[in-house]
C-alpha cells in the first residue's frame, strides 16, 4: 500500500467492466477505504451493472483486507444522457465510424458528466480521491478519455467546488495487455479469472457467448480490444 493514501478514502467509477474492475483492485491495494459509483444512463450494455455484485463478492473472497476496505456502492440514474445522445451505445444502431473520425459509440460528454456527478457525491461524503478507467493508449479516440481532459476536469472540479480533488487514472498510459498484467500483479490468477468470468465489456450486452477472455459478441470494438489484449498478455506471461 502507498503510505500517501494509507489513511484516505477513494471513490471509484465502477461500471462492472474489465477496466473499472482493475481500477477498483488498484484502489483497494492503496486506500484505506473504497466506495464505488456506477451509472445507469440508458446504455445498451446495461448488463454490466448487474455484474457488479458478483465482482464485489469475488473481490471480497480474494483478499480479506479488500473485503474490509470495500465501502458503500452507489448507483446514479441519468437517463437524460441517452435522451440527448444519438450513439450506438444508447440506440439500437450498427456500430460504425462517423464523418469526424470517431466511432458512433462515442457518447459526447459522458466522462465529463460522470466525473462531475462523482465529484458532487465525493464532496458530500468527504472524499477527495476519485479513480477512473480512462485510457489514452488502447482507446477509440474518445476526447474525454485523454489525459489533458482529465487534468482539466480535475482543475475545474477543484475550483468549482472549492475542494482539492485528485483524479487517478491508473490505466491512462497502458494498453489492454498491460491491463491484464496489472490485474495479475494486483490479485494473481484469482483476479484475472474473476475479470474474465464476471466482468462485462461488450457494447452489445452479449452474455451468451463465452471466450477465453470473457463474455461478449466478439465483434464490437470493445470485444476486439479485450480479446487482442488477452492474446498479447497470454503470449508474454
Curated annotation (Swiss-Prot):
<dbReference type="InterPro" id="IPR014729">
    <property type="entry name" value="Rossmann-like_a/b/a_fold"/>
</dbReference>
<comment type="pathway">
    <text>Purine metabolism; 7-cyano-7-deazaguanine biosynthesis.</text>
</comment>
<dbReference type="GO" id="GO:0008270">
    <property type="term" value="F:zinc ion binding"/>
</dbReference>
<keyword id="KW-0436">Ligase</keyword>
<feature type="binding site">
    <location>
        <position position="202"/>
    </location>
    <ligand>
        <name>Zn(2+)</name>
    </ligand>
</feature>
<feature type="binding site">
    <location>
        <position position="223"/>
    </location>
    <ligand>
        <name>Zn(2+)</name>
    </ligand>
</feature>
<dbReference type="InterPro" id="IPR018317">
    <property type="entry name" value="QueC"/>
</dbReference>
<dbReference type="GO" id="GO:0016879">
    <property type="term" value="F:ligase activity, forming carbon-nitrogen bonds"/>
</dbReference>
<keyword id="KW-0862">Zinc</keyword>
<keyword id="KW-0479">Metal-binding</keyword>
<comment type="function">
    <text>Catalyzes the ATP-dependent conversion of 7-carboxy-7-deazaguanine (CDG) to 7-cyano-7-deazaguanine (preQ(0)).</text>
</comment>
<keyword id="KW-0067">ATP-binding</keyword>
<protein>
    <recommendedName>
        <fullName>7-cyano-7-deazaguanine synthase</fullName>
        <ecNumber>6.3.4.20</ecNumber>
    </recommendedName>
</protein>
<dbReference type="GO" id="GO:0005524">
    <property type="term" value="F:ATP binding"/>
</dbReference>
<keyword id="KW-0547">Nucleotide-binding</keyword>
<feature type="binding site">
    <location>
        <position position="220"/>
    </location>
    <ligand>
        <name>Zn(2+)</name>
    </ligand>
</feature>
<keyword id="KW-0671">Queuosine biosynthesis</keyword>
<comment type="similarity">
    <text>Belongs to the QueC family.</text>
</comment>
<feature type="binding site">
    <location>
        <begin position="14"/>
        <end position="24"/>
    </location>
    <ligand>
        <name>ATP</name>
    </ligand>
</feature>
<dbReference type="GO" id="GO:0008616">
    <property type="term" value="P:queuosine biosynthetic process"/>
</dbReference>
<dbReference type="Pfam" id="PF06508">
    <property type="entry name" value="QueC"/>
</dbReference>
<feature type="binding site">
    <location>
        <position position="217"/>
    </location>
    <ligand>
        <name>Zn(2+)</name>
    </ligand>
</feature>
Amino acid at each position: 500500500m502507498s503510505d500517501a493514501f494509507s489513511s484516505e478514502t477513494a471513490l471509484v467509477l465502477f461500471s462492472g467492466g474489465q477496466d473499472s474492475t482493475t481500477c477498483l483492485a488498484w484502489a483497494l491495494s492503496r486506500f484505506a477505504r473504497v466506495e464505488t459509483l456506477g451509472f445507469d444512463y440508458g446504455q445498451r450494455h446495461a448488463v454490466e451493472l448487474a455484474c457488479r455484485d458478483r465482482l464485489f463478492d469475488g473481490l471480497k473472497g480474494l483478499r480479506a483486507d479488500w473485503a474490509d476496505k470495500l465501502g458503500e456502492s452507489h448507483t446514479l440514474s441519468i437517463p437524460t444522457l441517452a435522451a440527448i445522445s444519438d450513439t450506438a451505445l444508447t440506440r439500437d444502431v450498427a456500430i460504425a465510424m462517423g464523418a469526424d473520425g470517431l466511432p458512433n459509440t462515442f457518447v459526447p460528454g459522458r466522462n465529463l458528466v460522470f466525473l462531475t456527478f462523482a465529484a458532487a457525491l465525493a464532496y458530500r461524503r468527504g472524499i477527495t480521491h476519485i479513480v477512473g478507467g480512462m485510457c489514452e493508449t488502447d482507446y477509440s479516440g474518445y476526447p474525454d478519455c485523454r489525459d489533458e481532459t482529465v487534468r482539466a476536469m480535475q482543475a475545474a472540479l477543484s475550483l468549482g467546488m472549492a475542494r482539492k480533488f485528485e483524479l487517478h487514472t491508473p490505466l491512462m498510459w497502458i494498453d489492454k495487455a498491460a491491463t491484464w498484467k496489472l490485474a495479475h500483479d494486483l490479485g494473481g490468477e484469482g483476479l484475472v479469472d474473476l475479470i474474465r468470468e464476471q466482468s462485462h465489456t461488450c457494447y452489445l450486452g452479449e452474455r451468451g457467448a463465452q471466450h477465453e477472455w470473457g463474455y461478449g459478441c466478439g465483434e464490437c470494438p470493445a470485444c476486439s480490444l479485450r480479446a487482442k489484449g488477452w492474446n498479447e498478455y497470454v503470449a508474454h506471461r
